[in-house]
């Protein structure tokens, strides 16, 4: 006998069922299928062909209608309605379940305590429930009803009254208590509505509807079903946690990148994982020259939420990386949705901003470090009252030179020495991106890219015609040792990482600089020249109140400038402490060309004046440094040739070298600051005692520089030496 195979899908189960109907495929009807299936309360859909839409699911309810057949088979889908048999096994005709009758009205009982009337998931034992007299058959029917509700929540809500389950506002079984029905139901509805909504949380509804059972086996079944539902609940929790992490940021932005202008996206991504799964994709670093770097809105640490129309919220890290790689390889614009996150405790993926205050400022360490780098001494009390300075730099600017970075005091140019440029570039406020870099799995601390150096020089140093000249300047920095390659390459490349060299070497570099020496051979008599420092015994402020401040020993310097090796030939011993230099022996900016006024001051103060030809020194003659300074300042004539200025035999015979105490009255000094600046510090003698006389014959004096030839960027260095030597800015020590 011919038969027809009917394949039917029951509800949402993955595995279909097969039934053989003893009717030919050309004559099979719905009643034949129902007779073989034995299920009455269901909707039947069959695979059919429509002219407009193609293959569709057609619902057939007429028992005499023929069923559509494909390849001698019928494909059907069954949607169970309320009150049908559970779908855990193939149905049988004998197990058809009738609709449940409503539960009987229980007898009235006394009102329970108020604290038990409004709890969610009532925790009272089964003996407290009103339907304690219910039979096991009624419990089985309740079990079937709960399973049916699990299958189809929408139909369960629509037909809850038809199924015979009396449900409250939030899915709880109503207690039909005649004594306090209205008040108890109202209280339960209000409280449960504000706490749990059955439309949103199916787990709480099932838990509430199963509180009326008293069978141990029923409780065990409920416990097992609840364990089965835990994975979806944890999934919702994980999703909510992920959304919370992303929305906890300041804002979420959408960036559209035009990939036609750039060859690559230019980001590295970092995946975050924990025991609960993957925690999202974050921006690890941004590469120069990419589309993201050109846009500028995305920063390291931002969380990547979506690329184009693909959401990364519930996607694993591996899938997100694969999707992102596929999107980048496709042409067209890329839309990135990122959350601007900030992790207060980064795990090393990201770097803190350079201007972020991390540690409290220690003023003592700051001053000590600044003095070690710049070679300047700490400002001692009384410097603010030194208003007799007549140079172009005021006292306030001197103080600013210690408190502000050099970049705010002067502008850099191509004529600025390399040491000053590097010091400005190395300051934290310079704008150069200096951070830890990774190269071949090696961490390079405080490194910067060669292209960043060229860009910084091109934008901050004046005088470059094009970027190529800035690159040559950077190459000179590498050759001079101010920046170093990680493997000591001597050729500069913009694609390599560099670090700053030993910044203390800037002092060595500055001692060897030249500022267009003027030896006086040109015969120009009207040029302003810079005198060397005065010898000990000079007190440039005769009326300045004395103070008992003792210099602190600065950092020992191992650098000995070659231009000052002759200084050891002069003696700095005890002498007549009463002699003082006059104001005329100082080469100030306001009276350096006024020789007559300088002679009048020399006459009043009793200091040797050479212009008149006689000596008025009351406490011994001055040394040749002071004498040559007076010759240039007071005489007003042409400077002699270098041979005359470099030998002591040209001095008048009645000016033998004498020694003086460097300390001014009331100022005890335990060492000689000038000697300390020029050579490594010797052992400190007792207070008031200077090093003994040296037997080395005097050599050539330091070269005299033009004041106008000193670039403005050396102002801070000049002021530092003024404060160190205890002299105003009229004297400038040439350590170039």
Swiss-Prot record:
PTM (free text): Phosphorylated. Phosphorylation is controlled by frizzled proteins, correlates with the onset of embryo dorsalizing events and is higher in the dorsal half of early cleavage embryos. Phosphorylated on tyrosine residues in response to association with efnb1/ephrin-B1.
Ranges of residues in domain PDZ: 254-326
Cysteines paired by S-S bonds: none
Membrane topology (UniProt): Peripheral membrane protein
PROSITE patterns: DEP, DIX, PDZ
Keyword Nucleus attributed: yes
Main localisation: cytoplasm
Region entry Interaction with custos, spans: 327-427
Key words of the record: Cell membrane, Cell projection, Cilium, Cilium biogenesis/degradation, Cytoplasm, Cytoplasmic vesicle, Developmental protein, Gastrulation, Membrane, Nucleus, Phosphoprotein, Wnt signaling pathway
Region (Disordered), start-end ranges: 79-241, 574-664
Residue ranges of domain DIX in the record: 1-82
Localization per record: Cytoplasm; Cytoplasmic vesicle; Cell projection, Cilium; Nucleus
DEP domain residues: 428-502
Keyword Ubl conjugation: no
GO molecular function terms noted in the UniProt entry: ephrin receptor binding; frizzled binding; identical protein binding; syndecan binding
Bias type Polar residues, positions: 205-217
Pro residues compositional bias, start-end: 100-114
SUPFAM superfamilies assigned to the protein according to its UniProt record, in alphabetical order: PDZ domain-like, Ubiquitin-like, Winged helix' DNA-binding domain
Expression sites (tissue/organ): Expressed equally in both animal-vegetal and dorsal-ventral directions of the early blastula. Becomes enriched on the dorsal side of the embryo after cortical rotation. Expressed along the anterior margin of eye field of neurulae (stage 16 embryos) and in the anterolateral crescent that borders the eye field. Continues to be expressed in the optic cup at stage 26. Expressed in the central nervous system throughout the early tailbud stage including the entire hindbrain.
GO terms for biological process, alphabetical: activation of GTPase activity; anterior/posterior axis specification; canonical Wnt signaling pathway; ciliary basal body organization; cilium assembly; convergent extension; convergent extension involved in gastrulation; dorsal/ventral axis specification
A GO CC term assigned to this protein in UniProt: nucleus
Subunit annotation: Can form homomultimers. Interacts with prickle1. Interacts (via PDZ domain) with ccdc88c/dal and dact1-B/dpr. Interacts (via DIX domain) with ARP/Axin-related protein and dact1-A/frodo. Interacts with sdc4, possibly via fz7. Interacts directly (via DEP domain) with efnb1/ephrin-B1 and indirectly with the phosphorylated ephrin receptors ephb1 and ephb2, via association with SH domain-containing adapters. May interact with lrrc6. Interacts with custos (via NLS1 and NLS2); the interaction is negatively regulated by Wnt stimulation.
Function comment: Involved in at least 2 independent signaling cascades, controlling cell fate via canonical Wnt signaling and cell polarity via a planar cell polarity (PCP) cascade. Acts synergistically with dal/dapple-like to activate Wnt signaling, stabilizing ctnnb1/beta-catenin and leading to dorsal axis formation. Also prevents degradation of ctnnb1/beta-catenin by displacing gsk3 from a complex with ARP/Axin-related protein.
Domain remarks: The C-terminal region containing the DEP domain is required for membrane accumulation and phosphorylation. Wnt signaling and axis induction requires the DIX domain. The C-terminus contributes to the localization at the cilia base.
Protein name: Segment polarity protein dishevelled homolog DVL-2
Organism, scientific name: Xenopus laevis (African clawed frog)
Phylogenetic lineage: Eukaryota, Metazoa, Chordata, Craniata, Vertebrata
Gene: dvl2
């Amino acid at each position: 006998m011919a038969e027809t195979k009917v394949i039917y899908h029951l509800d949402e189960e993955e595995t279909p069922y097969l039934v053989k109907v003893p009717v030919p495929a050309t004559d099979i009807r719905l009643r034949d299928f129902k007779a073989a299936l034995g299920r009455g309360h269901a909707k039947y859909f069959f695979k059919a062909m429509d002219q407009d839409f193609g293959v569709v699911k057609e619902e057939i309810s007429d028992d005499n209608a023929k069923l559509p057949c494909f390849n001698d088979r019928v494909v059907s889908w069954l949607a169970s309605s309320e009150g049908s048999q559970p779908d855990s096994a193939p149905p049988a005709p004998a197990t058809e379940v009738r609709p449940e009758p409503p539960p009987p009205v229980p007898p009235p009982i006394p009102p329970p305590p108020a604290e038990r009337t409004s709890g969610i998931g009532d925790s009272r034992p089964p003996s407290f429930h009103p339907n304690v007299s219910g039979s096991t058959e009624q419990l089985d029917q309740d079990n079937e009803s709960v399973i049916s509700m699990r299958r189809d929540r929408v139909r369960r809500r629509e037909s809850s009254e038809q199924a015979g389950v009396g449900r409250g506002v939030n899915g709880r079984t109503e207690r039909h208590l005649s004594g306090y029905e209205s008040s108890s139901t109202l209280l339960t509805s209000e409280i449960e509505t504000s706490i749990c909504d059955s439309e949103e949380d199916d787990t709480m509804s099932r838990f509430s509807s199963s509180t009326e059972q008293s069978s141990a086996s029923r409780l065990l079944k409920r416990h097992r079903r609840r364990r089965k539902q835990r994975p979806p609940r944890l999934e919702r929790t994980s999703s909510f946690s992920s959304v919370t992490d992303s929305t906890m940021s300041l804002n979420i932005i959408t960036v559209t990148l035009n990939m036609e202008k750039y060859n690559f996206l230019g980001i590295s991504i970092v995946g975050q994982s924990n025991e609960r799964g993957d925690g999202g994709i974050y921006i690890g670093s941004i590469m120069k020259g990419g589309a993201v770097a050109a846009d500028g809105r995305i920063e390291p640490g931002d969380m990547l939420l979506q690329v184009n129309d693909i959401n990364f919220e519930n996607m694993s890290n591996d899938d997100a990386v694969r999707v992102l790689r596929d999107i980048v390889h496709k042409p067209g614009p890329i839309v990135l949705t990122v959350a601007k996150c900030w992790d207060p405790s980064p795990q090393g993926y990201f770097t803190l901003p350079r201007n972020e205050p991390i540690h409290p400022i220690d003023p003592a360490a700051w001053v000590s470090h600044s003095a070690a780098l710049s070679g300047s001494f700490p400002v001692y009390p009384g410097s603010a009252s030194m208003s007799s300075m007549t140079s172009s730099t005021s006292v306030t600017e001197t103080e600013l030179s210690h408190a502000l970075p050099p970049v705010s005091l002067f502008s850099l140019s191509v004529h600025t020495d390399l040491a000053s440029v590097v010091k400005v570039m190395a300051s934290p406020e310079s704008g150069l991106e200096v951070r830890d870099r990774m190269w071949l799995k090696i961490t390079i601390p405080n490194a910067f890219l060669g292209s960043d150096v060229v860009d910084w020089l091109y934008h901050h140093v004046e005088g470059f015609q094009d970027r190529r000249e800035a690159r040559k300047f950077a190459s000179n920095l590498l050759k001079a040792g101010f920046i170093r390659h990680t493997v000591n390459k001597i050729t500069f490349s913009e694609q390599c990482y560099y670090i700053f060299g030993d910044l203390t070497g800037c002092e060595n570099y500055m001692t060897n600089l030249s500022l267009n020496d003027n030896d006086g051979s040109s015969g120009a008599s009207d040029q302003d020249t810079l005198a060397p420092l005065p010898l000990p015994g000079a007190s440039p402020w005769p009326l300045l109140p004395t103070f008992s401040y003792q210099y602190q020993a600065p950092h020992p310097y191992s650098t000995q400038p070659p231009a000052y090796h002759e200084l050891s030939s002069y003696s700095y011993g005890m002498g007549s402490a009463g002699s003082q230099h006059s104001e005329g022996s100082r080469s100030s900016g306001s009276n350096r060309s006024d020789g007559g006024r300088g002679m009048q001051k020399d006459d009043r103060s009793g200091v040797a004046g050479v212009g008149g030809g006689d000596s008025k020194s009351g406490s011994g003659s001055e040394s040749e440094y002071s004498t040559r300074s007076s010759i240039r300042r007071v005489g007003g004539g042409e400077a002699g040739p270098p041979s005359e200025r470099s030998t002591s035999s040209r001095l008048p015979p009645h000016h033998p070298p004498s020694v003086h105490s460097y300390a001014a009255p009331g100022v005890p000094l335990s060492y000689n600051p000038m000697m300390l600046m020029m050579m490594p510090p010797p052992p400190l003698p007792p207070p008031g005692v200077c090093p003994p006389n040296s037997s080395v014959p005097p050599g050539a004096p330091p070269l005299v520089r033009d004041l106008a030839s000193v670039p403005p960027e050396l102002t801070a260095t000049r002021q530092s030496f003024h404060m160190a030597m205890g002299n105003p800015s009229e004297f400038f020590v040439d350590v170039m």
